[in-house]
Amino acid sequence: MITTRTARQCGQADYGWLQARYTFSFGHYFDPKLLGYASLRVLNQEVLAPGAAFQPRTYPKVDILNVILDGEAEYRDSEGNHVQASAGEALLLSTQPGVSYSEHNLSKDKPLTRMQLWLDACPQRENPLIQKLALNMGKQQLIASPEGAMGSLQLRQQVWLHHIVLDKGESANFQLHGPRAYLQSIHVKFHALTHHEEKAALTCGDGAFIRDEANITLVADSPLRALLIDLPV
């Protein structure tokens, strides 16, 4: 089953220095029916104004994945670690109890646009504190997984995350690990098909809950970029 969640249905925020779209309850936006999906707690698209920053804060034990769509960001923690990430890169932070983290748009004249996901982290697992990956913009790519398969970022949870790039008319099929997945459109229009021949059309910024499907096929109606988050638990 595919249930779409359009960009217009998501929570919105505009603070001047920050513009945001929230898939699930976050900050001032609250919907008791949308507190996350399986181990996916947060899925935001945010635009930080030139020079803007998120002040240091602590997090619950989650893995934070930032997919940089445009601009350049710097991340720092209270332990003295820092890293920069630019458009075309994904950065994974394995947050730790008692450690605070900040984010800063390094540009003085260009906004920073990125997708941010929070995934519940298994408390028994200890992964590298910071991991970074270059995105392959020419094809589909596994960018995060439990064991770091195929050079992907290593998560502390049973989640597989795919970055998908297709040209118009191309298609890609994905075998899912369990009964749940979430599909997020980044750019342009495409449709998703299940083996039950159920079909859902998505445009820029739309998402879709996928339930009880063994596989899903994406067909690009125009050049497409999307994320598929495979969430068996």
What is each PLM-predicted segment?
Residues 4-14, 21-31, 39-59, 69-76, ...:
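Conserved short histidine dyad/triad with adjacent acidic residue
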Residues 45, 64, 90-92, 114-116, ...:
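Conserved hydrophobic/aromatic beta-strand scaffold that supports enzyme active sites
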Residues 60-79, 87-90, 176-197, 204:
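Glycine- and acidic-residue-biased ligand/ion/polar-headgroup-sensing regions
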Residues 63-119:
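Contiguous mid-protein beta-loop-alpha structural module that forms a pocket-lining wall or clamp
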Residues 79-94, 135-138, 194-216:
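Short acidic-glycine-tyrosine-enriched beta hairpin
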Residues 95-125, 211-233:
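Ligand-binding loop in jelly-roll beta-barrel domains
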Residues 110-194, 200-204:
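Conserved, well-structured core segments that form or line functional sites
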